[in-house]
Structures are given as structure tokens and as C-alpha cells.
A protein has these predicted regions:
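Bacterial N-terminal signal peptides
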Residues: 5-16
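Extracytoplasmic metal-acquisition and chelation regions
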Residues: 21-304
Length: 304
């Protein structure tokens, strides 16, 4: 009888034993949390500070972010000073030594990526909001997405060695799907190779390089500087003279100036989402490109 009781007790304890504790991953962008979810699976729990419909340069720091950071095992950032305006004080106030920049629980996703527009001269405020270490919108190139995924897999394996086989398997699946999707995206964009475009902000050099587009100008006169009447006239003249068919505008910018330019030219306004979560349909890193490329292709076909 006692033997049966102890067997029952042992079985009960095994059933009641807590499952593997999930790694708490906080990211500054939903793009990184999407990739971390794909790699980590049910071994991670993710939270993104900036939502996909928000300007990642300007994030309102909330007390809830400090709480999330205080419990985080891993913090994934874009780096290149994209988060310089809000993140350092949040990290300090979290009092979590695991996620400081010199700690194992901190991952700069830009490392190893193809970073464009690294300044070759001293950066001054007269140049606008120029990032001194290069353009931080690097995740808009699928090749960089693969680099980011590999870095996340390596970091998760470092923090959770028992999950390495899971992370490696999920990484292989992610890379395989990304390769297949990229073939599809490149095929859709191929008819528009070398097309000239105008963008509101300088967010798309990596996207343009990968998909062979030429960014001819920006609606902002300088990065972070609102459109002016004189510069708007210059853009109108540029679009007319170069027969530029499309303007890419992020969802958090005022459409007043782009729409005005559209009335004076044949260029179409195309709302382009720089991050996962920009709309409900953009649920992950793959659907981010699906949505933007379909919107671009439809606009270009309509401009003919």
C-alpha cells in the first residue's frame, strides 16, 4: 500500500513540476520580437517596446516598460543610436544588470548587418537627425533579417544551452522560408528594377538596395526636418522631370504634403510600413514584405 502511495506521490510531483521557464525577451522593435518568436518558439516570451505603427525614433517611455525590462533575460536593440532618445534611462531604471550593454543579456541586432550611409565626415545638427553610425533601418533588407535571426539563435543558445537544438532547428526553418519568400519578392519587384522613387524619410536605403530601386529624393528637406514650401516645390519639379511614379510614406507621417505633391504630379502615395505590427495584417517579418511589396507593385502597375 505504501509502495503504491509513494509511486502515486512521485508521479504527482512529476506532473506538477513546472515546465521549462521561458526566457523573457524584450525588444525595441516588433520586427525583432517576431524573429525571436520564430526562433525561440515556446521557449521564449517576447515583448516589443515600440509598436509597428509608431515612429521608432520617438517612443514615449512608460513605467510599464521599466517593469518589463526589470524582468528581462534578453534585450534586443537596433543599435546605431536609433533608441538613444529613450532607452538608456529605461535600462538604468530597470536595475537589471543582465541587460546592460556590456552584459550577456544585451544584443545589438545591427552587428554583422549591411549598414548603409555611414557618415564619412563629422555629423552636426545642421545636417538634421543624421545617425552618426549609419542608417538604422537595416531590417528592411531580407538579407539582414537572416543575419539578425542567426544572432538571436546564437544568443538564445548562449542563455539557454538546453534549448540549442530547438533554436538551431527553428533557425533553419526560418532561413528556409525567408529564402523562398525572397525569391517570390524579387520576382515581383523585377519588372521595376532601377525605378526611381521618392520617400518621406530616409528609411528605405536597405530596401531599395535589395530590390534595386533608386531613391531620388526625400520629402523631408533633411532627416527629421518637416517639409518646407521651397523643398516641396523642388520635389514636385524632381518628380515631374524624372517621371517618378511613387512616393513611399511611413504611416506615422502626415500625408498632407505627399497628397499635395500627388495632385501636382503623376506620382502615387504609397503608405509603406517599416515594421511588423504596422497593421493587423502584418503579423510577422514575412508579411511585412508581403504587404509592402504588393502595395508597391499595385501602385506601379496603376501608374502605367
Amino acid at each position: 500500500m505504501f509502495k503504491k502511495y509513494f509511486l502515486w506521490l512521485a508521479a504527482s510531483l512529476l506532473v506538477a513540476a513546472p515546465a521549462h521557464a521561458k526566457l523573457r525577451v524584450v525588444t525595441t522593435l516588433q520586427d525583432f520580437s517576431s524573429i525571436a518568436d520564430a526562433i525561440g518558439g515556446d521557449r521564449v516570451e517576447t515583448f516589443a517596446i515600440a509598436k509597428g505603427y509608431q515612429d521608432p525614433h520617438f517612443v514615449d517611455a512608460k513605467p510599464s516598460f521599466i517593469l518589463k525590462l526589470s524582468k528581462a533575460d534578453l534585450l534586443i536593440v537596433a543599435g546605431l543610436e536609433l533608441e538613444i532618445g529613450y532607452l538608456p534611462p529605461l535600462i538604468d531604471q530597470s536595475r537589471n544588470d543582465k541587460i546592460h550593454p556590456s552584459s550577456p543579456g544585451y544584443l545589438d541586432a545591427s552587428i554583422g548587418c549591411d549598414i548603409l550611409q555611414r557618415p564619412t565626415t563629422q555629423v552636426t545638427r545642421a545636417m538634421g537627425d543624421v545617425h552618426p553610425y549609419g542608417n538604422p533601418h537595416f531590417w528592411t533588407d531580407p538579407n539582414n533579417g537572416k543575419v539578425i535571426a542567426r544572432a538571436i539563435a546564437a544568443k538564445l543558445s548562449e542563455l539557454d544551452p538546453s534549448g540549442k537544438s530547438t533554436y538551431d532547428k527553428n533557425l533553419a526553418a526560418f532561413e528556409g522560408k525567408l529564402d523562398e519568400k525572397d525569391k517570390e519578392w524579387l520576382a515581383k519587384m523585377a519588372p521595376f528594377a532601377n525605378a526611381k522613387i521618392v520617400t518621406f524619410h530616409d528609411s528605405w536605403p536597405n530596401f531599395a538596395k535589395h530590390f534595386k530601386l533608386n531613391v531620388a529624393g526625400h520629402i523631408e528637406p533633411k532627416p527629421g526636418i518637416p517639409p518646407t514650401p521651397s523643398h516641396t516645390l523642388e520635389i514636385i519639379n524632381l518628380i515631374q522631370s524624372e517621371k517618378i511614379p511613387a512616393m513611399l510614406v511611413e504611416p506615422y507621417f502626415d500625408l498632407k504634403t505627399p497628397n499635395y505633391i500627388a495632385t501636382k504630379t503623376s506620382a502615387k502615395v504609397v503608405v509603406f510600413y517599416p515594421s511588423v505590427g504596422g497593421t493587423p495584417e502584418i503579423k510577422d517579418y514575412f508579411s511585412l514584405f508581403d504587404r509592402n511589396i504588393d502595395a508597391f507593385v499595385n501602385a506601379m502597375k496603376g501608374s502605367k
